[in-house]
């Protein structure tokens, strides 16, 4: 005696319990089905036949009892193994067709093969052949709404056969069709049965059930009759095609854990995601807006911060990283400020680490030319000024040693002073300006440097001989501060220590001076700018977070709208991981498109800022980081909706509206 392909023993199914009343739908079903049988399960509405079909097709689990498939206890199978059975052993034909609305006939038929990992070329050819066999060769590209009811049901049958369809479970396949289309579908089922497929027909129509070779009647959750038209039909020799079904147990143990389908599934998921986004264009655009604004904000904020940092660093570095500044300071709050004398300046200049040294005697002063007044920093320097600061004269010349010795009333003005007092047209060289009402002749104009940081503008200064500043303007020979250029920019710390040691001797250990160097100032400014950039980026990231919440919201709505599609995919063999991947891919796709659009918008905004003379510097890490954040946002905020979709009950999903 042959082992039954399907063997049900005492199957019971109950719903409710606890706070709700217990409903017993199946009350002890005993049933065996062999390979090659055409069986009709008939019963009135509410008899439990659809529940029985769901259990037979591994869409649902019984409350109690034993279900053996090819000798394997189905209760011991995990969700992935059940999905494998639905994909490889069963093919479902539903009364409502259950086709995915956004997919073509060909794509609907190919779906089980995608989850089976069938190569694209092979599944395309097989789907086309099945549709051709069922008379739909000219309808392969049509969407379900472009097909008649009979054509949609034939697409459903083709889908059931895509992976072999050893067992066809047809739930009221003619219920929604006219008599002609219904007859065509029943003829197809007859042909499949004659070719060796197990056909299990669920119906309430006894005329339809009469087409089967074996009729099982169910009422109130119990089998009340089981008759075969001809005993020889049940025990007939099995078509060779049906022999494949008895090997399913071995194939189940070998193939249920296979992960070979992920590439095809991923491509299908991307294509499906793009189609859904396009169908709901307006809603997608509103969702994307949050991601676009978030990414663009992060990229632009970081670009502005980086541009400002580079501009400030370039301007500070232009003064030289080998510069040390020496100032007098008060050793304590009650003591007077220390003084660095010119004799000490000369002593410091003798140190081997010192290349050049220059005292500066200066301060803020009022400047007038004609009827124009301006406030500028006026510094008394010596002739080392251009060399120490790498600051050439672009008009005229710098004052000479003779001017320094003679305390000549000559001045070299900065670029901003030139702009304020003389504009672009006038030549300032040779003209006289009043500094604190003392006339000075302009002999040169310094090259433009720009602002170093904050409101400090290096170009808003005037250089005059040190002797002139001391005698004509400030009335003191003592310098305001000392500028020291070291010989080696890499050994500034060593030079600073040598200067400190000498000053300790000269000042008898008194700490009434202060040393700072340009390199340290540059590093400190860099840290400040980095902190500012981080703060700007963090503020902008809030909008990206809001965009992520929008993605989660739209994905939750999508899962709700496409619950039936999820059920269809599960019925055709999708595992929970496949559904998770499907909806996670859609969330990531939203983030990818939003991220790319955000980067494009950011580049456009950056170009506009550059035209407005705002320093902007886009960096690959910043752009890539913002895009990566968008992706991570998609994964994080898309995971919960995708997980919810993957955990849906197949039966509940299929019956949802």
Curated annotation (Swiss-Prot):
It is an enzyme of class 7 (translocase). SMART domains: AAA. Residues 6-245 form the ABC transporter domain. The keyword Nucleotide-binding applies. Its main location: membrane. It is found in: Cell inner membrane. The keyword Coiled coil does not apply. It holds the Pfam family ABC_tran. Gene3D superfamilies: P-loop containing nucleotide triphosphate hydrolases. Keywords: ATP-binding, Cell inner membrane, Cell membrane, Membrane, Nucleotide-binding, Translocase, Transmembrane, Transmembrane helix, Transport. GO terms for cellular component: plasma membrane. InterPro entries: AAA+_ATPase (IPR003593), ABC3_permease_C (IPR003838), ABC_transporter-like_ATP-bd (IPR003439), ABC_transporter-like_CS (IPR017871), MacB-like_ATP-bd (IPR017911), MacB_PCD (IPR025857), Macrolide_Exporter_MacB (IPR050250), P-loop_NTPase (IPR027417). ATP binds at residues 43-50. It is a multi-pass membrane protein. GO terms for molecular function: ATP binding; ATP hydrolysis activity; transmembrane transporter activity. The chain crosses the membrane at residues 285-305, 539-559, 590-610, 620-640. Its EC number is 7.6.2.-. Part of the tripartite efflux system PvdRT-OpmQ required for the secretion into the extracellular milieu of the siderophore pyoverdine (PVD), which is involved in iron acquisition. This subunit binds PVD and drives its secretion by hydrolyzing ATP. The system is responsible for export of newly synthesized PVD after the final steps of biosynthesis have taken place in the periplasm. Part of the tripartite efflux system PvdRT-OpmQ, which is composed of an inner membrane component with both ATPase and permease domains, PvdT, a periplasmic membrane fusion protein, PvdR, and an outer membrane component, OpmQ. Belongs to the ABC transporter superfamily. Macrolide exporter (TC 3.A.1.122) family. This is Pyoverdine export ATP-binding/permease protein PvdT. The gene is pvdT.
